[in-house]
């Protein structure tokens, strides 16, 4: 079997086009465009690339993005004060603080300071809690994007065994909730899991988010499985590789996401979607 490649780039383009069309309609009615505040603390090269792609997407579809590029030395108090100001700004519908933050700033405190209805990353405990209670509003962008990718396979997810490798707050944990919501039986594995191979081999749906190049050997993949590779790792040869050994996995899987061009573009697209949702909810 040769896997069908799920193009995140193509789906992301479709999502962004639909969001842009809705924004055009609102503006044509005399309403303001949605506003997104993007905060970057420090000059981490990877973060600058991510923030750049988010700002570019905003410009393409008509979201007013306001940039706040702060010095690495910015105090936690100063950042929290800025968030308070943005929480009270009626023209700002979404607030995004690019992670990771410098070590002297408590990221949990920062995430919790963002008003839940402006938390377009979907990281606030209130929004995570709503997902757990099966009443989601603003959902974490990467897991939500993955669910949209899974929809394109047209597979019935109910009753399927989904195995997640990685238990981060950003991907693994909310991903488990999304898959539960879709009717999957979910196993979450992490660095303390023994016999990881045994779990991976059982997976009808395999989501890998550990940040280690080709961490999962392709021959572990179950015949016909759906493989979602969240990892994006710059290797010594300069190439970008995912967390799954792509070529070998593609020989066994039914569907697989590429790296790059898989999950990454959908994360940005769902941020745009969430910003529109926040705008509509904020009325």
Swiss-Prot record:
One of its GO terms (biological process) is methionine biosynthetic process. One of its GO terms (cellular component) is cytosol. This is Bifunctional protein FolD. HAMAP family: THF_DHG_CYH (MF_01576). Belongs to the tetrahydrofolate dehydrogenase/cyclohydrolase family. CDD domains: NAD_bind_m-THF_DH_Cyclohyd. NADP(+) binds at residues 166-168, 232. Catalyzes the oxidation of 5,10-methylenetetrahydrofolate to 5,10-methenyltetrahydrofolate and then the hydrolysis of 5,10-methenyltetrahydrofolate to 10-formyltetrahydrofolate. Its EC number is 1.5.1.5, 3.5.4.9. GO terms for molecular function: methenyltetrahydrofolate cyclohydrolase activity; methylenetetrahydrofolate dehydrogenase (NADP+) activity. Homodimer. Pathway: One-carbon metabolism; tetrahydrofolate interconversion. It holds the Pfam family THF_DHG_CYH_C. It catalyses: (6R)-5,10-methylene-5,6,7,8-tetrahydrofolate + NADP(+) = (6R)-5,10-methenyltetrahydrofolate + NADPH; (6R)-5,10-methenyltetrahydrofolate + H2O = (6R)-10-formyltetrahydrofolate + H(+). The lineage of its organism: Bacteria, Pseudomonadati, Pseudomonadota, Gammaproteobacteria, Pasteurellales. InterPro entries: Aminoacid_DH-like_N_sf, NAD(P)-bd_dom_sf, THF_DH/CycHdrlase, THF_DH/CycHdrlase_cat_dom, THF_DH/CycHdrlase_CS, THF_DH/CycHdrlase_NAD-bd_dom. The gene is folD. Keywords: Amino-acid biosynthesis, Histidine biosynthesis, Hydrolase, Methionine biosynthesis, Multifunctional enzyme, NADP, One-carbon metabolism, Oxidoreductase, Purine biosynthesis.
